[in-house]
Amino acid sequence: MKSEEKIKLVSIVGPTASGKTELAVRLAERFDGEIVNADSMQVYRGMDIGTAKPSVSLRSRVTHHLIDIVTPDVNFSASDFRRAADGAIADIHSRGKRVFIVGGTGLYIRALLQGLVDSPSGDEQIRGELNELAKEIGNEGLLQLLAEVDPITAERLHHNDRVRIIRALEVYRQTGRPMSQFRQEHGFAEEMYDCLMLGINVERQELYSRVEKRVDEMVESGLAAEVEELFRLGYARDLKAMRSIGYKEICSFLSGEISLDQAVQLIKRDTRRYAKRQMTWFNKEYGIKWVEYPAAFANICNHVIEFFERGEDHAKSTFQHPGSVP
């Protein structure tokens, strides 16, 4: 497909609490657009506070897509996201609106823009066996097993990232080939859309201060009550969605394993670490234009105008790359 035939997107990325949603709403209002969510947790219904979903007032200003589309017991994957996002983008474009993608889930952004690794579909039996094995040898034991057959993928993963460790082992057991080989063959080279990627750069201590404030606000807004309601609806704490940051710690609090203060401190710590991992991911991605927000909003608007009118090359020239979050 020729570049001029591709739908133009503006994708806003960056770490949690960096101000992505606010910037996306302001740009969508300015350019008559709609927003497609690319946050892996905001797709879940009933998980509002802990996922920092856009407020009702923000969503009333601009139409948002792919929020509250599945229940917490659904394992919503990057491929599921890509299919849903492709549909939302086509719908928005067909009505003559601009498309803005916003979210901090790097894999979702990559899947949308460059496609996914052509690896085999999941095998529930193998996955179940690996989950049982994890109970015996722990996450570190699983990672060691992966290192023996796929050291490249093992090097990329943290031992607590059980889902991806099991997925890589699952692929190897199915095919006899390491996941890293599938990734190398794919190359993440296919460009699906014409996209201007804007990354919000926030100074480290300021970002961490925002993280702590956001967590305090979540707790004050009723995060524990939200988790209690999820329990009441029958969603168990071992679900993938319930093991995410904020929910797993409150589950431990409600089960009497830790105090509320301990839960809050753990959420803050884990969110800071998550923000650091997000920045590491996005710093390695090609073509992100890093901006200061809200200070440079007028400049951002000018570059978005140039991108929509003339293409990406002219728009990319004056953006600078940030340093990593230490």
Curated annotation (Swiss-Prot):
Residues the record marks as site: Interaction with substrate tRNA: 105, 127
GO BP terms in the entry: tRNA modification
Annotated binding of substrate, by residue: 16-21
EC number: 2.5.1.75
UniProt keywords, alphabetically: ATP-binding, Magnesium, Nucleotide-binding, Transferase, tRNA processing
Organism superkingdom: Bacteria
Cofactor(s), names only, from the UniProt record: Mg(2+)
Catalyzed chemical reaction(s): adenosine(37) in tRNA + dimethylallyl diphosphate = N(6)-dimethylallyladenosine(37) in tRNA + diphosphate
Stored NCBIfam families: miaA (TIGR00174)
Biological function: Catalyzes the transfer of a dimethylallyl group onto the adenine at position 37 in tRNAs that read codons beginning with uridine, leading to the formation of N6-(dimethylallyl)adenosine (i(6)A).
PANTHER family xrefs: TRNA DIMETHYLALLYLTRANSFERASE
Subunit-level organization: Monomer.
Record protein name field: tRNA dimethylallyltransferase 2
Organism name: Geotalea daltonii (strain DSM 22248 / JCM 15807 / FRC-32)
